[in-house]
Regions:
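Short His-Asn-centered micro-motif
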Residues: 10, 157-160, 187, 215-217
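Basic/polar N-terminal segments that are highly enriched at the extreme N-terminus
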Residues: 1-5, 72, 84-89, 256-259
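Short catalytic/ligand-binding loop motif for oxyanion handling, primarily in non-cytosolic enzymes
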Residues: 16-20, 163-166, 223, 241-242
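Conserved phosphoryl-transfer catalytic core
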Residues: 22-104
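Phosphate/adenylate-binding glycine loop and adjacent helical scaffold
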Residues: 110, 114-120
């Protein structure tokens, strides 16, 4: 008798959902509503926490011009506040302009910024709750989640924030799928291109790496997962980028192919 995986670890883009959902729906929505969201929620603790993380990330920025631009804007606004006694709202407006410019710069380059992903997640939350967004999933996803969850754990690992992941499956085109999902992981766990990230996930789900099946549409993510000891499957969905014929991973076109 063949024993199946104890954990089904899944990517989102190109695996559970079409790649186009993120690039053509979610990203444009976050970009369109970024400024309004920041201005409406600037003083909230979550936004300030993201801003603090953004500043820390910026200090490690490899593009020196962006480091200087963002850091100088932030420093100047604080100095102006202290020297002239300008009210908090005026200072916030100055800082928001700097933050928006840097966030748009990150978006344009598809940077995997944890602070950006967190902000995007909350913007999307507003969209889902307003009925303006729907988490599109492939037709085979719901059945597979229900089937797998009866004998194993279903977990998600995406570069999008955990909050954003939960929204996709809570407001999915197949209904609320969150009851079938045991755990969510994002870049706070580590880069998807690092074997250490998959070992960390194995510890958190309390399963040996060899009992975890990771499914993704990207070979550069599957390789480190396999190096960590995980089983792998390459998701080949409509709209995905072409993959090399000799990639070393078993290919699937539907979750129905996996027991």
């Amino acid at each position: 008798m063949t024993i199946g995986p104890r954990v089904y670890l899944l990517d989102i883009e190109g695996t559970t959902s079409p790649v186009s959902v993120v690039s053509e729906q979610l990203f444009p929505y976050a970009r369109k509503h970024l400024e309004a969201y920041l201005r409406d929620h600037w003083s909230e603790a979550e936004t300030q926490a993201d801003l603090s993380l953004l500043i820390e990330e910026n200090r490690l920025e490899s593009d020196e011009k962006q480091i200087l631009r963002f850091a100088q804007d932030h420093k100047i606004s604080a100095q102006d506040d202290k020297a002239s006694g300008i009210g908090e709202q005026s200072i916030a407006e100055t800082e928001i302009d700097s933050v928006i410019a840097y966030l748009l710069w990150l978006m344009d380059r598809d940077r995997k910024s944890t602070a950006l992903k967190s902000l995007q997640g909350r913007i999307w939350k507003s969209g889902y709750e307003a009925g303006e967004l729907v988490g599109t999933v492939f037709p085979d996803v719901a059945e597979a989640f229900e089937r797998w969850s009866k004998t194993a754990k279903v977990a998600i690992y995406s570069s999008g924030s955990v909050e954003a992941q939960k929204l996709i499956f809570r407001y999915s085109s197949a209904g609320d799928l969150t009851p079938f999902i045991s755990a969510y992981f994002d870049t706070r766990t580590g880069a998807k291109t690092s074997p250490a990230s998959y070992r960390a996930i194995a510890e958190q789900v309390q399963a040996a790496p060899k009992s975890i099946l990771f499914i993704s549409d990207l070979v550069r993510e599957l390789d480190p997962a396999r190096e960590a000891g995980c089983m792998t499957r390459l998701s080949v969905r409509e709209g995905n980028q072409p993959v090399p014929d000799e990639n070393g991973h078993t290919q699937i076109q539907s979750f129905a192919e996996i027991d």
